[in-house]
């Protein structure tokens, strides 16, 4: 996954995990390639979901959220140089969610937020408080279990707001356009034939 600029050099980076739980940082070289990988952690195979929300605690550095199968959610704050500050627990019971999406600032308050889908297809927004925790949460959609994949699309339509993508059971790629207030102003199919992919980022 991409945490954004994780080492503070102004270039986007990539973090990968191997089969034994080793975590590695591939720093972007700014020209479409990578600098040599370096190890930044071990034991990360205890997590079933690892995502890069951006700067979740408001210190100017990009961070990582990781969930254990038992539902505990942890914040690993980045130190701005490709390493970590001490982790903090930011939630329990997150194992009821089968998709975690990091769209950035979804409600327009300047803080990073999180979207989560449960097994019944309900989609929730968890608004960040800008200090490594949550301000509130509420449901913003139903029927999202009809989608095989859900993810953050960035600003897909150029209106300055973060959007969300989904792939349905027929393989259609759908874009859901944010209204900037933790809601939607429309959706449309923007592609087909995406059903055979095993992962979409």
Model-derived features: where do they sit?
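Trp/Gly-enriched beta-strand/coil motifs that build multi-repeat beta-propeller-like domains
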Residues: 1-201
């Amino acid at each position: 996954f991409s945490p954004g600029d994780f080492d503070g050099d102004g270039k986007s980076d990539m973090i990968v995990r191997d089969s034994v739980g080793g975590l590695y940082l591939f720093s972007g070289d700014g020209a479409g390639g990578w600098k040599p990988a370096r190890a930044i952690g071990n034991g990360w195979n205890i997590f079933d979901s690892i995502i890069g929300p951006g700067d979740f605690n408001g210190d100017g550095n990009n961070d990582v959220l990781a969930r254990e199968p038992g539902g505990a959610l942890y914040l690993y704050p980045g130190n701005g140089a490709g390493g970590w500050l001490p982790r903090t627990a930011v939630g329990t019971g997150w194992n009821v969610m089968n998709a975690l999406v990091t769209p950035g600032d979804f409600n327009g308050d300047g803080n990073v937020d999180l979207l989560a889908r449960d097994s019944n297809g309900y989609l929730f927004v968890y608004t960040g408080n800008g200090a490594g925790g949550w301000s509130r949460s509420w449901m913003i959609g139903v029927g999202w279990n009809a989608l095989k994949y859900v993810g953050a699309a960035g600003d897909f339509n150029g209106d300055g707001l973060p959007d969300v993508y989904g792939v349905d059971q027929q393989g259609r790629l759908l874009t859901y356009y944010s209204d900037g207030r933790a809601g939607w102003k429309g959706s449309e199919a923007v592609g087909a034939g995406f059903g055979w992919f095993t992962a979409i980022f």
